[in-house]
Amino acid sequence: MKLTKFVFFFVTIFSGSLCAAEIQGNVIRVLDGDTIEVKTLPAKIVVYEVPIRVRLINIDAPEKKQPFGRWSTSQLKTLVAGKQVTVSYSHKDRYGRIIGHVFTTNGTDASRFMVQSGAAWVYERYNVDESLPALQREAQEQKRGLWADANPVPPWEWRYKHN
């Protein structure tokens, strides 16, 4: 009986993190350097489809009005706009956006691409990918993208000052 209670408790507590979902679709809009809209691929059952808003996990890109904001958006557009992607996720944020790993058909992880090219920061507060800080350091050392700026301001600081 105690074992049954323990198993039930374990499954209840950790089920949210164990249940991952996946969607496939075409990117119909790139809103900024870390947010896209995906239209899911047609299913066998016809349903009313709405675009699904997805925020790339582990990163924070410059805001549109921030230095490098438009450039960051264009980097993500080059990678995924109009293309098929697979999104793997386990939760949504407070705005209802899926927070997920976005992969192109050739396997490129959009979050890693954005950090490696200097188009986004590792979002240290929420990052769970231990390899991303090294990619960011490499981008900084090579002065790629936003790291070409002498004093780039992280988006979370920029939002605090401008909102």
Describe the predicted segments one by one.
Residues 2-8, 17-163:
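Small beta-barrel nucleic-acid-binding modules, primarily SNase/OB-fold domains
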